[in-house]
UniProtKB/Swiss-Prot annotation:
Disulfide bonds join 229-231, 262-265. It comes from Methylobacillus flagellatus (strain ATCC 51484 / DSM 6875 / VKM B-1610 / KT). Keywords: Chaperone, Cytoplasm, Disulfide bond, Redox-active center, Zinc. It comes from the Bacteria. Its main location: cytoplasm. This is 33 kDa chaperonin. GO terms for cellular component: cytoplasm.
């Protein structure tokens, strides 16, 4: 049964509890194909990708994107995942030195977790930054949601280096629970019995049946997930414009060409003196906006 690269949302009837289940296969592999990540880093990146899709499905992005970052002070320098409102996802990581045998806490070493909601419509992005608290991706996100958003959220994430999967259960804000006051605790107790191999191997239908067989669960239509990198020559050109004509000229005088590789998809962009001259004699196009001069 094909269960990869889909997200399923579900709702516990007559309770203030909702959830979602995600499976990533091709989208995860495409994020890795241009990088030689160590196994422990592949696992962390896969878990963050699953988490980003789960959170994006609960937010009203309306054409925007959710960006999750773990900024480390240890050997792991950066994990970053971007997930758009239509579940297009991309990810990358930066590290130095040996990671094998290290715990997640040791890799990050007192780093920070950053969540950004980018409306992509010219509006002001929202960004939250908190210290990394917890020994796993799931614990970091649960702590953030509880402390910064005041929303009870639990997350279970798994990655075997080839596939990633996850499940989120969340208590909906401003929803009365008088009809079933024990629902949240009962559902979390059941969800806590899930095993990593079940997250990875079972379809959403089978997993819900296994965990919540006695509950009244409404499962919504699956949503496809795909790898998507939004880089382009135009966006790279706009970035060079922001550096300024003088600095770009200095770089070209030294290197003759400016070569830029996308960290997400490894696309290559090359700019020479003729390209640079065109950059600074044409209008800047801002994504999601009208042309600006």
């Amino acid at each position: 049964m094909q269960i990869s690269d889909h997200l399923h949302r579900f709702l516990f009837e007559n309770t203030p509890v909702r959830g979602s289940i995600v499976h990533l296969d091709d989208s995860f592999q495409q994020s890795l194909q241009h990088h030689d990540f160590p196994q422990i880093l592949r696992q962390a990146l896969g878990e963050l990708m699953a988490a980003s899709a789960l959170l994006a499905a609960t937010l009203k992005l309306k054409g925007g994107a959710l960006v999750l970052q773990v900024q480390g002070k240890g050997p792991l320098k950066l994990l970053v995942v971007e997930c758009t409102s239509d579940l297009g996802i991309r990810a990358t990581a930066k590290w130095s030195g040996e990671l094998d045998g290290m715990s997640f806490s040791d890799m990050v070493s007192n780093g920070h977790f950053v969540i950004t909601l980018d409306p992509r419509d010219g509006g002001q992005p929202y960004q939250g930054i908190v210290p990394v608290e917890g020994g796993s991706i799931a614990e970091i996100l649960q702590s953030y949601m509880q402390r910064s958003e005041q929303i009870d959220t639990r997350m279970w994430l798994a990655c075997d280096g080839k596939r990633a999967a996850g499940m989120l259960v969340q208590k909906m804000p401003d929803q009365p629970d008088a009809a079933d006051p024990d629902a949240w605790n009962r559902i979390i107790m059941l969800a806590d019995t899930v095993r990593d191999e079940e997250l990875l191997d079972l379809s959403a239908v089978s997993l819900i049946k296994r965990l919540f067989n006695e509950e009244d669960v409404r499962l919504f239509k699956e949503q496809p997930i795909k790898f998507h990198c939004g880089c382009s020559r135009e966006s790279v050109g706009n970035m060079l414009r922001m550096l300024g004509e003088e600095e770009v000229a200095d770089i070209l005088a030294e290197q003759h060409t400016i070569d830029i590789n996308c960290d997400f998809c490894n696309a290559e962009y090359h700019f020479d003196e003729v390209d640079a001259e065109q950059l600074f004699t044409t209008e800047i196009v801002m994504p999601g906006n009208d042309v600006r001069h």
